[in-house]
């Protein structure tokens, strides 16, 4: 086992604080509307340019192991805030640095770190309660656009495109971000339910322009096994042909004689039919077939519920206004399922989301909710170069997370104002002893840090602005984009409550751990062995002319 260095007390904390400062100083230059970029080296290809706090934090690894421990703990603040709220990583880092910087002075002065921590916890609980009271629900598309713009570093076009996407697919809808092909951002909306399975044979195509099979007012047959014998399908095909409507078959597989017969009937124009594979695998496939059945008002034909293909009636088939089947995707538009049944199914999946333990399962369940409840919107990010594309895409993703957080828990005044107002509203928070009081005082001072940093990045005088904002009331604050004071909500400077709350809680949590650290253990640096001496060259005779 490698030898370890053990460092105690003040020296340990001082080294950790150095690491915290190095990381936080690199991250905080990105804060606010006049925040700067950070350039990240890449081992190959062009460097990455970013204004995203967590992207900067993740890149930082310090040579000094003790400093690195401090930096890694603050990195945890940024990534936890990103995971929980999707934004606010820079604010969380700035708050953590401020709490550590103030707190280490108190600890050095001999105050009890554990009581300081208890005081910090009391203050944070009181501030979070005030933030929740001040929170205002996001109701309008304009507010959603404003939240998105602020999170995307004051880029109004990004805020607007996210608000448009949410208008189209609903607040529960799936919104994905992809690389665009042009210089402008574009929004593509897929209405209805789309799943990633296309036609089983190109002979089903009836629209050569779109290279797709379009079915108007079709029936939908859902079967959970393979279909290889056409005899099994004949009763259904005869009933559908009599009704004179097209048919979409969704099964585990359609192969052999069954597929060949369907293709021949389609080519001859006897029957308009398309076959696709069922989406998903295993248990997820069954669940998705059930989703499609509820959406279209049909049933999944499965032996376990006593249904077989021979006994299928038209009442067992689903229906939709229109279905488009492409090479890789199938889209069901305006299914005939009852709204109450769809709502009940969505509620059931939401309960599963709450109980899900893995992120992957949760994501897949959320996709299913979105497909049932709304639709899918794709934001295609446009840029002139690949470097700009990456930077812009990261900002769009940040803005998307922030708007979701705003919809979830509401909004508060942005620009660091909400924390100052929470401090005023919390009034006189009392600790059980003077050391706890010091912890409370520490937090109340530290929460000025985000506003101070926004002003500093805009080239202003932080103390003057903080005093002016503290003397104001309500949503009165400072707009660093144009150096004016006014009502932050009216100026469209908003933060999601969840983002501000999560940033404060995570910063206080990790900063408390740093302040209560009394010893650090790290691998001792290896002594570089001296290079071996050059061997004797011997007599190099015979060199004379």
From Swiss-Prot:
InterPro entries: Chaperonin_Cpn60_CS, Cpn60/GroEL, Cpn60/GroEL/TCP-1, GroEL-like_apical_dom_sf, GROEL-like_equatorial_sf, TCP-1-like_intermed_sf. Pfam families: Cpn60_TCP1 (PF00118). Its EC number is 5.6.1.7. It catalyses: ATP + H2O + a folded polypeptide = ADP + phosphate + an unfolded polypeptide. Keywords: ATP-binding, Chaperone, Cytoplasm, Isomerase, Nucleotide-binding. GO terms for biological process: protein refolding. Signal peptide: none annotated. This is Chaperonin GroEL.
